[in-house]
């Protein structure tokens, strides 16, 4: 089963709010998920607000889940991909 780390949309019209989730690549955007990793609020007052469970994200990355482009950018901004690369190269 191909697994992706991606965003599911919540919120109202013109006021998006996203959950960062792990889901089967074949399921629809807002369909069934495997696990929720965190939230992303791009409309926050000063800067986009990101809350993510770092340990869960690293676990899924080690298990082979592929992040989408947007989630890849979010994870790199939060420093999670750097930690993943360090752990991967340390082995």
UniProtKB/Swiss-Prot annotation:
Any GO molecular function: structural constituent of ribosome
Keywords associated with the record: Ribonucleoprotein, Ribosomal protein
Cross-referenced SUPFAM superfamilies: Ribosomal protein S16 (SSF54565)
Any one GO CC term of the record: cytoplasm
Family per record: Belongs to the bacterial ribosomal protein bS16 family.
InterPro entries: Ribosomal_bS16, Ribosomal_bS16_dom_sf
One of the Pfam families matching this protein, by short name: Ribosomal_S16
Protein name per UniProt: Small ribosomal subunit protein bS16
GO biological process, one term: translation
Stored HAMAP family: Ribosomal_bS16 (MF_00385)
Encoding gene per record: rpsP
